[in-house]
Curated annotation (Swiss-Prot):
Family label: Belongs to the universal ribosomal protein uL13 family.
CDD domains xref list: Ribosomal_L13
Record's protein name: Large ribosomal subunit protein uL13
UniProt-recorded Gene Ontology molecular function terms: mRNA binding; structural constituent of ribosome
Gene3D superfamilies assigned to the protein according to its UniProt record, in alphabetical order: Ribosomal protein L13
Organism: Stenotrophomonas maltophilia (strain R551-3)
Gene encoding the protein: rplM
HAMAP family registered for this protein in UniProt: Ribosomal_uL13
Function: This protein is one of the early assembly proteins of the 50S ribosomal subunit, although it is not seen to bind rRNA by itself. It is important during the early stages of 50S assembly.
Keyword annotations: Ribonucleoprotein, Ribosomal protein
Pfam families: Ribosomal_L13
GO cellular component, as recorded: cytosolic large ribosomal subunit
One GO BP annotation of this record: negative regulation of translation
Assembly information from the UniProt record: Part of the 50S ribosomal subunit.
């Protein structure tokens, strides 16, 4: 008996709809990253993208515990001297709420070409509207 290895052509990828309203940021994102990698499937293979497509709605209604809204900071550097841009989680949620979930999930995925391929299967939207009705996503309760 030989060890089973999933092939990229034979992997079945489903579409799921996740409502982020009232969910804790970290707990939701760890489960999203797990499902993007495909670790919830019995055919999981580390070097093959076996994960599903995830559509996350209501990203603007995500919840964090403690004082993270003021204390958690996001940094980005333009490359110019003295141009380190910093914003708090509250400011980031106000400006672009979908990017908060995307950043958290991206940090939990592998770095490299396979991780980028997994990340492309995540679709995050601030409100309840999304353009993926044709894919008929199943509602996933996390």
């Amino acid at each position: 008996m030989s060890t089973f290895t999933a092939k990229n052509e034979t992997v079945q990828r489903d579409w799921y709809l996740v409502d982020a309203e009232g969910k804790t940021l970290g707990r939701l994102c760890t489960e999203l990253a797990r499902r993007l990698r495909g670790k919830h499937k019995p055919v999981y293979t580390p070097h093959v993208d076996t994960g599903d497509y995830l559509v996350v709605i209501n990203a603007e209604k995500i919840v964090v515990t403690g004082k993270k809204l003021q204390d958690k900071m996001y940094h980005r550097f333009t490359g110019y001297i003295g141009n380190l841009k910093t914003e708090s989680l509250a400011q980031a949620l106000e400006r672009h709420p979908e990017r908060v979930i995307e950043t958290a999930v991206k940090g939990m995925l592998p770095k490299g070409p396979l991780g980028r391929q997994m990340y492309r299967k995540l679709k995050v939207y601030a409100g309840t509207e999304h353009p993926h009705a044709a894919q008929q996503p199943q509602v996933l309760d996390i």
